[in-house]
Amino acid sequence: MKRVLISALMLFIFTASFAQKFNWNKNQVIAHRGAWKKNNFPQNSIASLNEAVKLGCYGSEFDVWMTADGVLVINHDPEFQGLTIEKVSYNDLLTKTMTNGEKIPTLEAYLLEGKKQKTTKLILEIKPSLISKERGIEVTNKSIEMVQKLRATDWVEYISFDYDYCKRVLALLPKAKVAYLRGEISAEQMKADKLTGVDYHYSVYQKDNWIENAQKLGLTVNAWTVNAVPEMQWLLAHKVDYITTNEPELLFEEIKKTPVAQGWKLKWADEFDDAGLPLTKNWSYDVGGKGWGNNELQYYTDADSANAVVKKGNLNITAIKADKDANHYTSARLVTKNKFDFKYGRVEVRAMLPKGRGLWPAIWALPTDWKYGNWPKSGEIDIMEHVGYDPDSVHGTVHTEKFNHVIKTQVGKALKVNNPYTEYHVYAIEWFADRIDFFIDDQKYLTFNNTKKGSGDWPFDQNFHVILNVAVGGGWGGKKGVDDAIFPAAMKVDYVRVFQK
């Protein structure tokens, strides 16, 4: 009996010592063709794979083709240095060398290299054959055979632009993680066909609540190929599962910056992806032309595309020289009142400002129910104001009964901004029960603290709503007159997002 127990114990120790212990990276970064760009490594090389591992990427994506003599090799394009991969032998390919001295990797060599670590997944893309569908299925079969032969199943996830290849992978490996790339198949259909994820171009997700709906079905959502900061931040804000990028180093930096990384959750947003008039589910209009308490000169129109229109992914609020009632200018003032009202949170707006003396663009918030009485008793938060006669200067301001511009006690600060008329900047506040912080491009430049002395100091314990407008003239904006040569003049808004904790 004692001998049996000792033998069993030794078998357990032996088995445990050879058991795989994985520690897959828990982030959203998939290096597209490996991490090649920053260090000028060849794409789809062993060097780019190892760099992705070194960076700590969740995955390193690579592409599989088959030579004329049946060897599986790694390359993105159908040609490798002038040779059509599917029409030449592997030995023909060996006559060519990558810029770092590597030969074209075989799938076997790539998997063996990938298996040396247990932190970064290998994202295997099966390329559609240019010769025949049947050949593509053969590539799929042989890829699975190689993965199984090398016992690399735990490392590998699969993607393809051919839906039949995806289904073939699942027929051979029912537990494999498989995602489809092309973009035309619904999340519901992929779920029914037992795919585990969707991997579409990021533009597909910018409508119809794609990300949220797919995730509700239990599908992972990956976006390709995302190399610019605005798209990265949009996807991160919407909690996409993975992002495939040529810029993994940049994406890691953006992940650190995103509000989501600071514990914020996106509650409401308008990304302005639907061309035409602004969405009525999100926005109403303040309409009229009687000065708006500031002796402004414009008439704010109601759903007039000359003054408020979405095109090319931006909301354009345009002030123009046009007669309306007793006014000689028209513009627009959009509000989320009674469509999205909120108390506390982070509001961020990415915008490019109009240039010209006499303009007064603003991104701000007013109380929805005026809990403590009319202005200024119930408060005002000016996230961004700019007056055209003071170029490149942007203001953040708070108004209350005790602190307001009428009695010259308002609390605010101006900050110089580089190229506000030709580049987009992110204007934001973070509003808590004890303070309001103001930011431009993540630089905090003002804090207004709750003194806890009552609503005269702090009326900011009630619902507010967002306002976007471009005024003309006014006591502040028109202090040095209006230059009629500047019209039309538009504030372009890329997005409005509100986060809460």
Question: What are these model-predicted stretches?
Answer:
Residues 3-4, 33-34, 334:
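Hydrophobic alpha-helical segments, especially transmembrane helices
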Residues 19-260:
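Phosphate-group recognition and catalysis centered on beta-loop-alpha active-site segments
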Residues 15-16, 45, 76, 398, ...:
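Residues in and immediately flanking transmembrane alpha helices
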Residues 257-501:
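GH16 jelly-roll
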Residues 8, 132-133, 416-417:
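Short, surface-exposed loop/turn motifs that are enriched in glycine and acidic residues
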Residues 9-10, 35, 66, 78-79, ...:
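Short, flexible active-site-adjacent loop segments at beta-strand->alpha-helix junctions, enriched
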Residues 1-23:
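Bacterial Sec-dependent N-terminal signal peptides
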